[in-house]
C-alpha cells in the first residue's frame, strides 16, 4: 500500500477568507455535512486556534492531531505535535493502520500554508460571498491542479450562501 496522501479540507469565500475571530464567518449546514463525510475515520491535522474553535472537541470518529508549540497545551483526546512533519508521520501511520488512503489537514491559515506544497488533493468549498475576516486560505495556483469533482449548492435553509464543492488533485 502506498503512503496515505495529504489532503487539505477548506472552505473559503471569494475574497479568500476562511475565518473571523476564531470562527467560520458563515453558516453552511450542507458544507458541514460534506466536511464530516470527507474527514470521518481519517486523521485530521489542525492548528491550536482551529482546535479551540471547534464547538465539540475532539471531532468524533477521527484521530485529532493538533499542532502547537506551547509546552503546557495538553488537550484531552488529541495528539499534540510541535511540527507538521511529526503530525504527518503520526497521522499517516494511523491512517495506514486503519486502511485509510489520506490524512486531512483542516486549518488554519499557517497550517494550510505549511501543508499546501505537500498536498496531493484539495477538498475546497468555494463560498459565493465576500465576507470580512482575519484568516485567509493561501494563494492557490489553479494551473497546478485538476478538478475531478464539482457540486453546486444553492443558498437555502441552513445555508447562508450558495457554494461550490470542488475536489482538486495535483497535476
Language model: regions and residue ranges:
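Enzymes that bind and transform nitrogen-containing heteroaromatic metabolites
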Residues: 2-171
